[in-house]
Amino acid sequence: MNSPLPDITATDEWSALKDNAKSIESTTLRDLFANDQDRAKNLSFSVADLHVDLSKNLINDDTLTALIALAKKADLEDHREAMFSGRHINSTEDRAVLHTALRLPAEESLHVDEQNVAADVHDVLARMRDFAHALRSGEWLGVTGHTIKTVVNIGIGGSDLGPAMTTQALRSFATAGISGRFVSNVDPADFTSKVADLDPAETLFVVASKTFTTQETLANAHAARRWFLDSLHLEDGTDEANDAIAKHFVAVSTNAEKVSEFGIDTNNMFGFWDWVGGRYSVDSAIGLSLMAVVGPQNFMSFLEGFHAVDEHFRNTPLEKNVPVLMGLLGVWYDDFLGAQSHAVLPYSQDLARFPAYLQQLTMESNGKSVRIDGTPVTAPTGEIYWGEPGTNGQHAFFQLLHQGTQLVPADFIGFATPNDDLPTADGTGSMHDLLMSNFFAQTKVLAFGKTADEITAEGVDPSIVPHKVMPGNRPTTTILAPALTPSVLGQLIALYEHIVFTEGTIWSINSFDQWGVELGKKQAGELLPAVTGEKGVDTGDASTDSLISWYRENRK
């Protein structure tokens, strides 16, 4: 029997951070900046096109030194190399973790389990490019001879969130007249609302399911099949219907038998691999709908952005390694300063779905309570990720960030040049500049606040002064980029992927399985006969029995 893992919380490095936390709690960001004129310069970093300012975080030099020491104690560098080299670090499923291989340049090779996975990746990319070119050029025609104008991606989880988020984020790069829509929820309203105004003759469905057995995805895929055939007055099972299905449905899957049974030509099936987790798969064939909308060249630029951050993460010393530092800050706030959530605030409407995407990436990865050896964790793990685009969030939940009792570290993401801009009301200014003035103001006020003396000096009624005090000392990280391009989007996603890896390594958890998700799916299948009335209500607990009985009595 293997000996249990060392307990990171019992180390001198952990103790040093506990001591440092006491020191940090007795200081302020105002003091930290006043005592170090070079703080902003020393705590600003570059990774590819991203400018990352960590200076408004609740840290001092001793904090960073202790966090780096903790990373080394946890063998972060060795674990990082194990991932990049293809070792089976997903221990519960005995799999390599190689999303980084999805964006390797064509001239590189990576042999894992006696297979050149880089060559396999580029074989699939070549087929994806051919498919996207055919759609975008009008070479691919539907059953009535019309070109395809809408690609509807049917998937769930990583097979939906990634393509949906990135297609919205890169809408400015959709130039071929093809739009993307995304269906994920098994709630029928999701499918019916997404296809209500579509012409089936000009619609193509991408069914994304690795096993082609995912309950929600297959339910929506069959709904799409019925809608498509009924709309074109085709009888299912006829040669004419089968020909139509083959021209309007493609699959992202590895189960050729199931794909063929559905009626999809397996020549139009795009595969991926067990070493790609769903939440890390947007740059695999799961991104087929994105490539169709923005084009192969932009998709390859997207991959190049990922790879640039991969190289930074793999090769940069820990002290200047941006995803490492941001991951260590996550551990710092979670385990030493008592934060339980993390806000992501993109000042870009195009990134409206980015916080939701990060919810799956971070919470499905690091929402674990046992370590890789099966023993309980000894410190809090994971953070609740949430957020909305600015300035919407300012008028919704920023009040809590500024004056509430919760410590909520926040990442602000902004861009120097917008993909869209309009003049201000007087016609002399830029709405993007107005947006970014709010961006900079929020990080400033969160950090430095406003004291009672400063408010009193403005002549405010003394009884109101306490209500207007802004305590400040609310930590933020600022991420700026020249513009939201395919490459920059890839860089942002890779940045957070490696933040997740860093945190998971410190906590000694497996960031690449999701057994909590699996059990829920299994239970749903077992309960379905009781829900539909095919069998009696006897689920094993009185609450669930009562709820299903109420549902059946009120179901119309």
From Swiss-Prot:
Pathway: Carbohydrate biosynthesis; gluconeogenesis; Carbohydrate degradation; glycolysis; D-glyceraldehyde 3-phosphate and glycerone phosphate from D-glucose: step 2/4. It is an enzyme of class 5 (isomerase). It comes from the Bacteria. InterPro entries: G6P_Isomerase, G6P_Isomerase_C, Phosphoglucose_isomerase_CS, SIS_dom_sf, SIS_PGI_1, SIS_PGI_2. Keywords: Cytoplasm, Gluconeogenesis, Glycolysis, Isomerase. GO terms for biological process: gluconeogenesis; glucose 6-phosphate metabolic process; glycolytic process. It is found in: Cytoplasm. Its EC number is 5.3.1.9. It catalyses: alpha-D-glucose 6-phosphate = beta-D-fructose 6-phosphate. One of its GO terms (cellular component) is cytosol. The active site is at residues 364, 395, 521. GO terms for molecular function: carbohydrate derivative binding; glucose-6-phosphate isomerase activity; monosaccharide binding. CDD domains: SIS_PGI_1, SIS_PGI_2. Pfam families: PGI. Catalyzes the reversible isomerization of glucose-6-phosphate to fructose-6-phosphate. Belongs to the GPI family. HAMAP family: G6P_isomerase (MF_00473). This is Glucose-6-phosphate isomerase. It comes from Corynebacterium kroppenstedtii (strain DSM 44385 / JCM 11950 / CIP 105744 / CCUG 35717).
